[in-house]
Amino acid sequence: MTDPSQSKNAPAPVAFVTGATGLLGNNLVRALLAEGFQVRALARSEAKAKQQFDGLPIEIITGDLQSISSFSAALFGVDILFHTAAYFRDSYTGGNHDQDLEAINVKAMKELLDTSWKAGIRRMVHVSSIAVLKGAKGQTVDETMLRREDEADPYFRSKIRSEKVLNDFLADYPEFWACMVLPGWMHGPGDRGPTSAGQTVLDVARGKLPGIPPGSVSLVDARDVALAIIACLSKGKRGERYLAAGRHQTMADLIPLIARLTDRKAPSRQIPMPLLYVIAALSEVQARLTRKPVLMSWATAKALASENDRSHFSAHRFHHDLGLTFRPLEETLTDEINWFRKAGFLP
């Protein structure tokens, strides 16, 4: 699955991974090592990176997308840039985050591209999001069905703009090669954050979920997304999008499955949308008072409402262009739960 341009006698290609300690990033690092890459892993915290990677043969680069100059020297000698880092909804503490979204997802993207080009990097896989796409309820959405900025929330809008930055760069630099992978709601082992996906599993396992939230998602294993990212190097086309969104799942089906796999009783009641908005409003207030991450942000509640049954995404390019298949949902959740137990999140 590695880049076919690399001969057997050539030194192992050097990969630079942003967001390396995140759910996707750490699974990508492991997949790259398995494919024979040398890996430079960007992390804001060296201690967190050492805990996450536990002695794996990688080079940890300490740095932050808000200060790209602090790690720019580590970009020299890199063959491929994998950009998984972003400011996203799981980072929210309630309130308005437009400034951070623009700074990290859009402006830092442009600076990273410019700096990488100057360092000699000519290949990149950018992790975008299903947020840049939109279709009608129940419709199968493919990579061509773009969401308009004027109908996007701040996070969705920032991902649309980050893609535009990359496409503009590709137009200006014909020698630069890049494509985009669009994940769904990622689950899987290694979710040390945890993300909203992992927190949902933990809440069900701990019996803390008061009811089943409304809505639907497109759920994917982070390891499958990592494989798609690597497959793009040999099978992807310049400037193209590749959905790695997984499968449509209603929360009404997903929550009982998690409960069964964690030996818990599933919540018996469903949370109506009006009540979800009340919970989100109260969570925003609590987050502002405590400065802790919001349990249910207003943006998340709005997204659940607006995106309900808009989680049917095409897997054609994933299957036919990249030659991949999604692993069973139960396997993903079982591995995720087992990892949480091993890591001490669950007994």
Q: Positions of the model-derived regions?
A:
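Glycine/proline-rich active-site loop of Rossmann-fold NAD(P)-dependent oxidoreductases
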Residues: 174-176, 188-199, 232-242, 264-266
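Conserved Rossmann-fold NAD(P)-dependent oxidoreductase catalytic core, especially the SDR/UDP-sugar
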Residues: 83, 87, 98-99, 103-155
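Substrate-positioning beta->alpha
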Residues: 111, 196, 213-234, 240
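NAD(P)H-binding glycine-rich loop region in Rossmannoid oxidoreductase-like domains
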Residues: 54-107, 115
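A conserved pocket-lining segment of Rossmann-fold NAD(P)-dependent short-chain dehydrogenase/reductase
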Residues: 93, 147-150, 199-220, 224
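N-terminal Rossmann NAD(P)H-binding glycine-rich loop of SDR-like oxidoreductase domains
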Residues: 13-35
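Active-site Tyr-X1-5-Lys
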Residues: 152-179
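Mid/C-terminal beta-alpha module of Rossmann-like enzyme folds, strongest
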Residues: 228-298, 315, 321, 328-347
